[in-house]
UniProtKB/Swiss-Prot annotation:
One of its GO terms (molecular function) is glutaminase activity. This is Pyridoxal 5'-phosphate synthase subunit PdxT. Belongs to the glutaminase PdxT/SNO family. The lineage of its organism: Archaea, Methanobacteriati, Methanobacteriota, Methanomada group, Methanococci. It comes from Methanococcus maripaludis (strain C5 / ATCC BAA-1333). SUPFAM superfamilies: Class I glutamine amidotransferase-like (SSF52317).
């Protein structure tokens, strides 16, 4: 059984753990850099990206995660943290060749749910102060999901990033299955 680490600094950690169990993987909450040992993949959940970034710096996660050779899934703020830039000064992992528009859909009250397609399957996506991809900075970045014309899912190498919260919808398991099949099992 594959072990999926979930960065346990902020966000819907328990909901991600439940989703990981649904795809017959073992969740492991990552609270220290030592916890990264022995995992097959890492999930960076949503939350507040500036706060998570500062905590990642404080706990020594930035360089450790940058040097991981395992698949990484970033959801919402996790997408922001993986990116090359946001137009705002904040700590980033700087490993996904995209720029991000933070809070592209507006404030908390502008949050919404919508059916979108990921990996050829329809999924009920929950967008909470969600980001969008601004610019794609290299040819190896592939678009895997859109909301109308807005890019809300990309992949590059062993990295997958989505701007919505799959852990908050009943069929969000589709996103985890996609990550497992297309990244974790191929690693």
């Amino acid at each position: 059984m594959k072990i999926m680490g979930i960065l346990g600094i902020q966000g819907d950690i328990e909901e991600h753990e439940d989703a990981v169990r649904k795809i017959n993987c073992i969740p492991k909450r990552i609270r220290t850099v030592d916890d990264l040992e022995g995992i097959d993949a890492l999930i960076i959940p949503g939350g507040e990206s500036t706060t998570i970034g500062k905590l990642m710096v404080s706990y020594g996660f930035i360089d450790k995660i940058r040097n991981l050779k395992i698949p990484i899934l970033g959801t919402c703020a996790g997408m922001v943290l993986l990116s090359k830039g946001t137009g705002k000064e904040q700590p980033l992992l700087d490993i996904l060749n995209v720029t991000i528009k933070r809070n592209a859909y507006g404030s908390q009250k502008d949050s919404f749910e919508k059916e979108i397609v990921l990996g050829g399957k329809e999924i009920h996506a929950v967008f909470i102060r969600a980001p969008q991809v601004g610019d794609i900075l290299s040819k190896d970045v592939e678009i895997i999901s859109k909301d109308d014309e807005n890019i809300v899912g990309v992949k590059q190498g062993n990295i997958m990033a989505i701007s919505f919260h799959p852990e908050l919808s009943d069929d969000g398991v589709i996103a985890y299955e996609y990550f497992l099949k297309n990244f974790v099992e191929k690693n």
